[in-house]
Amino acid sequence: LLSRPTILEIINSFKEEGIVVNGGFRESTGGRPPQLLCINGDSAYAIGIDFEFPTIRIALANAKREIVGRRKILFKIDTQAEEVLARMLRELEHLLEEFSSVRPRIVGIGVGICGTIRKTEGRSLHITRIRGWEHVELQRILQEKFHLPVYVNNDVHLLALVEKKKYMREDNSDFVYIGIRSGIGSAYMYQNKLMDGVQGNAGYIGHTVLNAEGPMCVCGNRGCLDAYAGELALNRRYQELTNSENESYYTMRDFMKLSRNGDAVSQK
């Protein structure tokens, strides 16, 4: 345990650096009213990139975890790798230009990405859904362009950490998280530790073959889990059942909303 003088020293250093600020006073129960301290949201910022494909979401958040700016890119499914990367960099650049006043206080970029990765190198090895996306040195590219620290990890693994932090009790230390997105992935938490594998690819279940004679998957195999239950498969099936040529892309959350609102096809 930290001693009272040590805690006060840490708090004072945070005040000097502008990380915490006075937040008023609590009602006294006797003696001097206790002073409240708050995180100064403007003290630091971070960029998050949710690289799911065909959707990429970019957000700028402050130290209080409040999103102050965002971008969303929806690609056509046949978009080439070079265009995907170039447009993502361009949108990130535009976001930084819009919030140029806080640029000196941005501490880093975090990327949650689909597909297989080499986490220790910040490299995206392969994304089946993007033509030509092979061994993209995402960490190096972002660091060289924006001169910020960059962290790359599997998107579903990061979502599992969010689920744990926001919605689960502290004693829920063991669980399996299934992420149904444009593809399907999973994450395993054991004794509060994410079992993500040596390079961050544990739980890569979307291309597990369920039926060798099943529907064609984007990976070239038949009957993968993704080909049955991933968002791309659900969108394709929805268009078939509704005889629709609508190019709108529905997420799993969208399908659930449609179902609750009485959409018969979504309910199937």
Give each language-model segment a name.
Residues I67, S124, L194-M195:
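Hydrophobic "anchor" residues
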Residues N22-A46, V150, N154-F175:
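Conserved phosphate-binding catalytic cores of ATP/NTP-utilizing and phosphoryl-transfer enzymes
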Residues L1-N22:
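N-terminal helix-turn-helix
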Residues D171-Y228:
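Glycine-rich phosphate-binding loop of actin/hexokinase-like ATP-binding domains
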Residues R71, F75-D174:
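Glycine-rich phosphate-binding loop and adjoining helix at the ATP-binding site
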Residues L225-K268:
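A mobile "lid/hinge" subdomain adjacent to the ATP/sugar-phosphate binding pocket shared
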Residues P33-G69, Y177-Y190, E231:
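Gly/Thr-rich phosphate-binding beta-strand-loop-beta motif of the actin/hexokinase/Hsp70
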